[in-house]
Amino acid sequence: MLGLLGSTALVGWITGAAVAVLLLLLLLATCLFHGRQDCDVERNRTAAGGNRVRRAQPWPFRRRGHLGIFHHHRHPGHVSHVPNVGLHHHHHPRHTPHHLHHHHHPHRHHPRHAR
């Protein structure tokens, strides 16, 4: 009886160690893959006023922020039932300082507006 109990405990230790190593490798792979800063340059001059740079993210992390933090944007006229949880803030392209500065008056140095 003690031989069977000893072999069962040994199998349990080996299984537990294997699971722990696999979880550690998964965590390491997730951190390395998520921490990698591959930048995709998206050229959209009319909407963004220049080149926008966004980070490439793997599919499990898209639209969720960092591992389960809710990422909720408030839009005008939209009544939200979910409170704004997390530390994210959404910026519209028209709210950038460059666009605020040039929003209400023409570009004097631009050839179209020169008289």
From Swiss-Prot:
It is found in: Membrane. It comes from the Eukaryota. It comes from Homo sapiens. InterPro entries: HRCT1. Residues 86-115 are annotated as: Disordered. The lineage of its organism: Eukaryota, Metazoa, Chordata, Craniata, Vertebrata. This is Histidine-rich carboxyl terminus protein 1. Keywords: Membrane, Transmembrane, Transmembrane helix. It is a single-pass membrane protein. Residues 87-115 have a biased composition (Basic residues). Pfam families: HRCT1. One of its GO terms (cellular component) is membrane. The chain crosses the membrane at residues 9-29.
